[in-house]
Amino acid sequence: MREEEQEEAKLWENVASPDGDTKVEALLQLSYNAAGQQEYTEALAFCETARETYEALGALASSMKMAHIYFGIGHCLRHLNRSADAAIALEKSVELYQEVGSEDALHILNEEGDAWYEAKEYQKSYDAYRRAIEDSNPDTCDSIVARNYVDAGTALEKLKEWSKALEHFTEGRARYKKLKDLRIMAHCDEEISLCYVWLGDGVSALVHAQLALDYAVTAEDDVHLMWAKSRMALSKKTLGQYQVALDLFAEAKSMMVSQSNPPWKAIIKLEKQNADILKKLDRMDAASEVLRRISSFEEIFLDEDERGDPLV
């Protein structure tokens, strides 16, 4: 018998053990093994059985281990695209880790925020990221705090709270500057520029779009070049420089569609901005044609409240 088969046979023997701790450890290891094979339905079943077994121990159950079990459940549920259920499990994991004063709670708060974001529960997502920021020790967890500021800003963008999003991205950028992480600084500049666009400040939007573009060109980073150009286009549009904006939108779109996995949602939004410029230039037929052409894409990639003529 191969070594792996012997190990699995031993785990199943332990699953049958009358000792609760032994059984739970075996179930968790079987869950890890299944997750490693991307068998998340099976991995989830092992985790849930481990939870039921451990809960039956009552006062003997360790909060630390139960927190770990709930984290495993949340991890599996995220991979099964059950994001809201995953967030609830991760929230429970956070509570249990906090009971024992474990710093793991900070990392899992971020994952909880991610899960709520995936579930399109953006306020709950923001709340989780904010708790992670507030519970962190900025002297020892600067990279964690920086990440949570940026993630919180992203949730706020979805809530269209542009001023608050701007504050979070600005703070995140300052922290990533201290960490000398130029790539994420560029991402922050892109989002800061977007916030300024929606706040109607084209000059400030252009400053940060240019910073993002400078990084992308210098680092020869095609992904950030694509996004920086789209931010430059939005900035120019806000400043009324419509032809320059159209040219930059065209460049950004060409780069987007050449990606192996094109960001269709962003492409649709970009095309809507194009149509809006064409209307401002009194080219109504051309604008209508752009909107007609992307209407079928909207049905596939946009949520109901994002469809139709309004800019998103």
What are these model-derived regions, one by one?
Residues 12-13, 51-58, 92-98, 130-138, ...:
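Amphipathic alpha-helical segments of tetratricopeptide repeats
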Residues 21, 61-64, 103, 143, ...:
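Residue signature of alpha-solenoid helical repeat architecture, marking inter-repeat boundaries
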Residues 25, 64-68, 107, 147, ...:
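Residue register of alpha-helical TPR repeats
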